[in-house]
Each structure stands twice: as structure tokens, then as C-alpha cells.
């Protein structure tokens, strides 16, 4: 299938036009309206520094239904230990930059480019992008960030520089999102770690239905998801 070249108009091609690997379109921009439209349609940007902007909608999609979250014994013990203080939206810029510095298994470099940093910091300022932080003795040692729309949290990246710090941040986020009535977390691509916590791969069509059930519909101004504050 052809790869669509985006133009200035805020539109994306039908998702079933994506390549088998999930690549749907190239180009466009990282403006808030385009990013929000993309997320609300089940699309996300992911590209290297030397690439044009690439837009993806993989099939299958890795998701975590909050009711299916599995807290294993070691992580439960870590949470009870209370070694880390977890906060929300206290250090968004620091978290996304720490994620950008985290080495990738695929090789050197980062997909969180300078343009991506600016785009998500702008989304954060608009109340759509959020961070979760794990602190140890006043130092940021782990965390994650993503986008909250309706009853879905779209996870983007996480980091840690102490054992289990990002896992504690994630588990704490799951608990608070469940209390706020969220339905699911979009994990985008599966990993053994995510699957061990209850995430599963679902067909793209099922994922889109889950988004609708969570109150997320295609829009350049979708409803903001409520987010914990502490």
C-alpha cells in the first residue's frame, strides 16, 4: 500500500491503509491539533531524528485494561516498602528529557527529538500531556509521561535510574486512573514487561472500539482526561 504524504489540512488516511508494520503516513506537523486528532484516531508519531515525521497505527495494538492490571509479589512488596515518593505533573520537562536520554535497545540516538520535546511540553501546558514522577530523597529517579483523553491514557515513554522506580510510578498511575474512572492505557507496542502486568494485544478494530467506549472520538479538540494531582 502507498504511504500517505500529509498536507496542511488536518486529516489522516483510513487506518486500514497502514502498512503491515503499522506505518500509516509521513509528514505534516506536531501541532497540538494534529497530535490530538492523531491520538483520538488511534495514531501516534514515532520517528528518529534524521527521519521525517512518521505516523503509526499498529495492528495488533498493545493495551492494558485497568481491571486486568496484575501486581506481582515483588512489585507489591516494593510499593509497601514505600521507598519512592510518587507525584503527578510536578516535573514534566524533567521526565520527558530523562526519557529522551534513556538508551534504546535498537541502538544509539532517541526518537524524542527536540521538536517532540517542544510539542509535548506544549500539550502539557494545554492540559493534555501528563507526567508521573518517582523520587528518592528528593531526587527524580524514575517516571513516565503520556497523553490523557477521555477515559484513556496513551503511554509514551518511561525511564528509571533506580530499581523498580518506573514500575512503582506506573503501578501508582494505574491505581489512580482506576479511581478516576479510566478504562484503559494504550501501550502502543507490546513487550514482555507489559504483558507480565496484564497488557494484551488486540486487533486494531477492537482497539478503536475500546477508544470509543472510553469516550475518545476523532477530534482536533477531544475531551481532556482527568488526572491525579498530588
Curated annotation (Swiss-Prot):
Which cellular compartments is it found in? Cytoplasm
State the GO CC annotations.
Answer: cytoplasm
Its family remark reads: Belongs to the L/F-transferase family.
Assign the protein's first listed, main location to one coarse class. Answer: cytoplasm
Q: Please give the superkingdom of this protein's source.
A: Bacteria
Q: Does the keyword Transferase apply?
A: yes
* Enzyme Commission code(s) on record: 2.3.2.6
Q: Which Gene3D superfamilies did the record assign?
A: Leucyl/phenylalanyl-tRNA-protein transferase, C-terminal domain, Leucyl/phenylalanyl-tRNA-protein transferase, N-terminal domain
Q: Which organism is it from?
A: Syntrophotalea carbinolica (strain DSM 2380 / NBRC 103641 / GraBd1) (Pelobacter carbinolicus)
Annotated GO MF terms: leucyl-tRNA--protein transferase activity
Q: Which Gene Ontology BP annotations are present?
A: protein catabolic process
**Catalytic activity field:** N-terminal L-lysyl-[protein] + L-leucyl-tRNA(Leu) = N-terminal L-leucyl-L-lysyl-[protein] + tRNA(Leu) + H(+); N-terminal L-arginyl-[protein] + L-leucyl-tRNA(Leu) = N-terminal L-leucyl-L-arginyl-[protein] + tRNA(Leu) + H(+); L-phenylalanyl-tRNA(Phe) + an N-terminal L-alpha-aminoacyl-[protein] = an N-terminal L-phenylalanyl-L-alpha-aminoacyl-[protein] + tRNA(Phe)
The UniProt entry, under InterPro entries, shows: Acyl_CoA_acyltransferase, Leu/Phe-tRNA_Trfase, Leu/Phe-tRNA_Trfase_C, Leu/Phe-tRNA_Trfase_N
Q: What's this protein's name?
A: Leucyl/phenylalanyl-tRNA--protein transferase
Which keywords does UniProt give here? Acyltransferase, Cytoplasm, Transferase
Question: Any idea what job this protein has?
Answer: Functions in the N-end rule pathway of protein degradation where it conjugates Leu, Phe and, less efficiently, Met from aminoacyl-tRNAs to the N-termini of proteins containing an N-terminal arginine or lysine.
Amino acid at each position: 500500500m502507498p504511504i500517505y504524504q500529509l498536507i496542511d489540512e488536518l486529516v489522516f488516511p483510513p487506518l486500514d491503509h497502514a502498512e503491515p508494520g503499522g506505518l500509516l503516513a509521513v509528514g505534516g506537523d506536531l501541532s497540538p491539533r494534529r497530535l490530538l486528532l492523531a491520538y483520538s484516531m488511534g495514531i501516534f508519531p514515532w520517528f528518529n531524528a534524521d527521519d521525517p515525521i512518521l505516523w503509526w497505527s499498529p495492528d495488533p495494538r498493545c493495551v492494558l485494561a485497568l481491571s486486568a492490571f496484575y501486581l506481582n509479589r515483588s512489585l507489591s512488596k516494593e510499593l509497601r516498602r514505600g521507598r519512592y515518593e510518587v507525584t503527578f505533573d510536578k516535573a514534566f520537562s524533567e521526565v520527558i528529557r530523562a526519557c529522551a536520554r534513556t538508551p534504546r535497545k535498537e541502538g544509539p540516538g532517541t526518537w524524542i527529538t527536540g521538536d517532540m520535546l517542544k510539542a509535548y511540553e506544549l500539550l502539557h501546558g494545554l492540559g493534555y500531556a501528563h507526567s508521573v514522577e518517582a523520587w528518592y530523597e528528593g531526587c527524580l529517579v524514575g517516571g513516565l509521561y503520556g497523553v490523557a483523553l477521555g477515559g484513556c491514557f496513551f503511554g509514551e515513554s518511561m525511564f528509571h535510574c533506580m530499581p523498580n522506580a518506573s514500575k512503582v510510578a506506573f503501578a501508582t498511575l494505574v491505581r489512580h486512573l482506576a479511581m478516576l474512572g479510566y478504562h484503559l492505557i494504550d501501550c502502543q507496542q507490546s513487550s514482555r514487561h507489559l504483558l507480565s502486568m496484564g497488557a494484551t494485544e488486540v486487533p486494531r478494530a477492537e482497539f478503536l472500539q475500546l477508544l470509543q467506549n472510553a469516550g475518545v472520538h476523532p477530534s482536533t479538540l477531544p475531551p481532556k482526561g482527568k488526572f491525579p494531582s498530588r
